[in-house]
């Protein structure tokens, strides 16, 4: 099923309401990382350049619903947008009754949608109020597409026209390219502390990919399932059978050497050893150089790569070499590569490979749910509206 795209519509003179994900970190009234604002900027500029009356809405943090709070106000985001665009972007607090002005080619930013009662529960009355403000609703926030809320789902049901913004459309296209008809061989990297939190992702990818690289605590569980000693490493002993059943479906190249320490700390001494030599008081905190080199070769010959999660505790430099080696291999590969998940983005930043990854997903939870094959409510609503 397809969706209507904002780029296919004539926006001139239209009231265009765009839902973006501008949930950025703010400290002392200043935006400290503007990656999400930068990602949304092309959509906002495009609508303004086409002569639309542009309204942008987003959530910020987790305020108590229905209560205005200074710390969750969109004011710092408005100030940051103003500096990026070179003109004032007013932040409108009481907008639900439409008591504000926007010129053609102009822009206003609405105050935090979570200050509105009924936002989280996808309240119909609130959804209709949002919808009444616009001629065209643009859903451009992939990061919140997995939540059925009034500003992502309900408004799309009642707006005269509901479409996908360029950011959301690009995200769906990239994920579709990686998961629906991947060029082979396809290699997926799934790493994290627990198998239990990534179980659906592992199961889903085991059906699609040719090789599944596991890392972090997840790898320890797979190592233990293959009868290797993992010492006092993070490991889920109750999921060994689950790990074995996944390993029976897809090739999972396990590390042959690892980097261990006696404690989990920034100053812990790193020790490289073959997997067979892990002792009872060891913690496995990264894959070893031999394993990293072998996996890098695997990645270089791949045609599609999906990356979710660092393979070691890369925040501590002595346990970051595995993740660094794989990040560089993905960057050097000719494969179509897609990466997503908070820790993954931090690793991409740390090792400076963002320019070399084909697509970096902006959604954490939404990215994982899409990979799991789940329906994203906001996207499903756009598909439904397109089919009318």
Curated annotation (Swiss-Prot):
The protein's predominant localisation is cytoplasm
Q: Which Pfam families match?
A: PGK
Q: Does the keyword Repeat apply?
A: no
The biological processes this protein is annotated with in GO are:
gluconeogenesis; glycolytic process
Q: Where does this one sit in the cell?
A: Cytoplasm
Q: Which reaction does it catalyse?
A: (2R)-3-phosphoglycerate + ATP = (2R)-3-phospho-glyceroyl phosphate + ADP
Q: Which GO terms describe its molecular function?
A: ADP binding; ATP binding; phosphoglycerate kinase activity
Q: Which residues bind ATP?
A: 198, 315, 341-344
> What pathway is this protein a component of?
Carbohydrate degradation; glycolysis; pyruvate from D-glyceraldehyde 3-phosphate: step 2/5
Sites where the protein binds substrate: 21-23, 36, 59-62, 114, 147
Q: Which UniProt keywords apply?
A: ATP-binding, Cytoplasm, Glycolysis, Kinase, Nucleotide-binding, Transferase
* InterPro entries in the cross-refs: Phosphoglycerate_kinase, Phosphoglycerate_kinase_CS, Phosphoglycerate_kinase_N, Phosphoglycerate_kinase_sf
Q: One cellular component GO annotation, for this chain's record? A: cytosol
Q: What is known about its subunit structure? A: Monomer.
What name goes with this protein? Phosphoglycerate kinase
From the broadest rank down, the organism's phylogenetic lineage runs: Bacteria, Pseudomonadati, Pseudomonadota, Gammaproteobacteria, Oceanospirillales
Tell me the name of the encoding gene: pgk
